[in-house]
């Protein structure tokens, strides 16, 4: 409650290392800049920018809000202090150096100094690597106990649980 609906946008295929992966906050009737949302230029007039971005061409596949009962690091999940999301990053098959294959933590905080934030929606963000070299992770989910689960593409389809233990 308090943040709204979140969705990811992996950009267009065949754009090389452009554009960035996006985390967007859904707003009714909004335009999100596609296909003119180039990371080297300002958000096109009349559109809404992402509330967070990540390494281009790595595919943010799944995203989930960290529940308040989770022992994993994160914010309080309220409009005053901010929210923490976790996302699986599948990785790129189309780069010289491997990228992705990780889980990232996304802290969404109220924009400071009465600014509109990076998206124009009143939020700022910080994205950090949480777990690396996790294979090619499929969408992740938190369970009712606050533990984080993910599976990987290929191999044996093992389901992994991430806790603080």
Model-derived regions, located:
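Hydrophobic residues at beta-strand termini and immediately following loops
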Residues: 34, 130, 162
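Blade-level signature of beta-propeller repeat domains, shared across WD40, Kelch, NHL, RCC1
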Residues: 139-165
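Conserved loop/turn at the beginning of each blade in beta-propeller domains
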Residues: 56, 132-134
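Short glycine-rich, acidic/polar surface loops and turns
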Residues: 126, 137-139
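Beta-propeller domain segments
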Residues: 1-127
């Amino acid at each position: 409650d308090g943040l709204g609906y979140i969705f990811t946008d992996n950009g267009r295929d065949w754009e090389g290392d452009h554009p960035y992966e996006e985390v967007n906050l859904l707003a009714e009737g909004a335009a999100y800049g596609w296909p003119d949302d180039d990371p080297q230029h300002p958000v096109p007039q009349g559109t809404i920018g992402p509330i967070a971005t990540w390494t281009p061409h790595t595919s943010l596949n799944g995203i989930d809000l960290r529940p308040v009962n989770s022992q994993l690091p994160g914010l309080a999940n309220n409009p005053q202090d901010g929210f923490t999301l976790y996302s699986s990053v599948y990785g790129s098959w189309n780069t010289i150096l491997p990228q992705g294959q990780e889980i990232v933590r996304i802290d969404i905080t109220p924009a400071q100094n009465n600014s509109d934030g990076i998206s124009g929606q009143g939020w700022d963000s910080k994205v950090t690597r949480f777990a690396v070299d996790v294979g090619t992770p499929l969408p992740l989910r938190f369970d009712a106990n606050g533990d984080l689960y993910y599976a990987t593409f290929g191999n044996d389809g093992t389901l992994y649980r991430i806790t603080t233990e």
